[in-house]
């Protein structure tokens, strides 16, 4: 049993498996070299599938890393919510916004296109708003319970 648990932890950080997505994102935010404001608006009854949690964690980690390396920002906002926005069905929405210089792109060959590919496996999508001069806002959406 322990070896199976150890193997499964190789695919997800222990905090994610032991304490869930919110704790995992809190940990990422605390370790960021740029101050991160973490805002969440989640339904109390929300239970996410493990693959959704892993993808959301991975996307957040990559976006925070990209902001720290490339944005020139001095503040980041990380948002996590589950909502419908008037659309049919519920979705998990993860948004990272920084006050940096902008210029991020979803073009092939850029790191963000790989995140979009990862989300597409869950029928999710990634949207990037990053005008020259900033700010950059990246929004990941994954449908829940469809």
Report the location of each language-model feature:
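Coiled-coil dimerization/phosphotransfer module
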Residues: 1-146
